[in-house]
Amino acid sequence: MKNFLTLLLVLVVTTSNAQAFKGKGDTKFQVGASFQNGGTGINSTLDFGIGENMSFGFSATYLLKADAILNIEPKFEDRADINARFNANIGNVLKLDEKFDLYPGLHLGIRNFGAHLGARYFFTDGFGVYTETSIPIAQYNTKSTGFQNYNNQFVFNIGASFNL
């Protein structure tokens, strides 16, 4: 009986690993808070594994609270941003814990072409936390008037990550 329980425990532990990035076919959904100069909001991402260390996906941000400029409130299009993104999931390349994924990447959106650096840690096979920062590399509109800087500057995101 003791050997049976030991074997059962080993099987449960080895089959319930919380791997952060599994490669091709892996799907991650993340939702969290977004912080930037002049506004805070929500961010969500959806990433699809396309190779052992590569993923492609989409990101959307909406500023729930955005500062008015010259007593003018920002419109929906000033608060919203959508991006297509490519990540290099390098946690296993750097021989990090399999529950931890580090992913630098590039994104192309409605406001800019930029870079991001993210990390996620999974507590279970389905649930973890993430943090991500992003910066614009090339802005489509370089005027610094009005609401051009919203979603077009250094942005910090933090939230929950889910395996789908």
PLM regions with names:
Residues Q30-N43, F76, G105-H116, K143-Q153:
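Solvent-exposed loop/turn segments connecting transmembrane beta-strands
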Residues N3-L5, F21-F29, T40, E52-F56, ...:
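Outer-envelope beta-barrel architecture signal
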Residues D47-D125, F162:
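Gram-negative (and chloroplast) outer-membrane scaffold detector with strong preference
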Residues L63-L70, R120-L164:
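Predominantly the C-terminal beta-signal and adjacent terminal strand-loop region
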Residues A18-F56, F86, G91, S161-N163:
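Short glycine/proline- and aromatic-enriched beta-strand/turn motifs that initiate or cap beta-hairpins
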Residues D26-S34, G57-T61, Y103-H107, E132-S134, ...:
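Transmembrane beta-strands of outer-membrane beta-barrel proteins
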